[in-house]
């Protein structure tokens, strides 16, 4: 396998050929904001937050880090003024449509959207607040789906299809009416592995058995073997 040498923010980076910029940055402790990328899932490019400046073959342009492969000698800049303005606009748009229920959300404290909002020091944005008011779906004893918190990152859809091989959920409708759900809004029929909860960055998917049992920082992590993955 060929090794590609390039630069991110003046830091020399090496990565296997075919690696995308986002993963190469992760592997080398370089932070690029992102909410839809997951190393175990196919690239989706839905959140638009991993926007970076790329110079390769003497041409400079802008790319999404999760969808652009590394190339020999490329120069990547993560935080130029234009890049920062673009990311801020994307975040302002997401927050204008997102249910701000952080005090009662079990994801609070480990929420990707919350963390990036804090990092960017965002105040109320320029966009008019237009939030959805979907009913919370609790059609089974294990999982619940709050579409008002969903940013349509696609992680849960990919995890259900690619890891579990079930495909119980998918995108519904188009445009501003797009939501995550089951076919014909039928009750969820799956193995209830919790993969959707594990990969969700915003708390749209929740484990009903853990609701209000503690804050994210109060739980201890324990190495274990997942019966669905072993």
Question: Model regions: which residues?
Answer:
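N-terminal cofactor/phosphate-binding cores enriched in small/glycine residues
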Residues: 4-72, 81-86
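Fe-S ferredoxin-like electron-transfer domains
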Residues: 48, 52, 56-227
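Short, surface-exposed beta-strand/loop patches at domain edges
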Residues: 230
């Amino acid at each position: 396998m060929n090794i590609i040498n390039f630069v991110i923010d003046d830091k020399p980076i090496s990565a296997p050929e075919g690696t995308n910029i986002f993963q190469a940055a992760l592997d080398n402790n370089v932070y690029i904001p992102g909410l839809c990328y997951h190393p175990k899932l196919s690239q989706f490019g839905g959140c638009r937050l991993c926007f970076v400046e790329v110079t390769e073959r003497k041409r400079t342009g802008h790319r999404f880090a999760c969808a652009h492969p590394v190339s020999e000698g490329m120069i990547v800049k993560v935080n130029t003024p234009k890049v920062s303005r673009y990311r801020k606009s994307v975040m302002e748009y997401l927050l204008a449509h997102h249910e701000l229920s952080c005090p009662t959300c079990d994801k609070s404290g480990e929420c990707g959207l919350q963390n990036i909002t804090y990092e960017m020091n965002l105040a109320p944005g320029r966009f008019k607040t237009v939030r959805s008011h979907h009913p919370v779906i609790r059609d089974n004893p294990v999982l619940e789906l709050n579409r008002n918190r969903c940013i349509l990152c696609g992680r849960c859809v990919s995890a259900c299809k690619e890891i579990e091989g079930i495909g119980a959920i998918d995108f519904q409708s188009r445009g501003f009416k797009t939501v995550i759900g089951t076919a014909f809004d039928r009750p969820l029929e799956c193995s209830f592995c919790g993969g959707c909860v594990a990969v969700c960055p915003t708390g749209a998917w929740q484990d009903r058995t853990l609701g209000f049992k503690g804050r994210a920082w109060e739980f201890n992590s324990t190495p274990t073997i997942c019966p669905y993955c072993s």
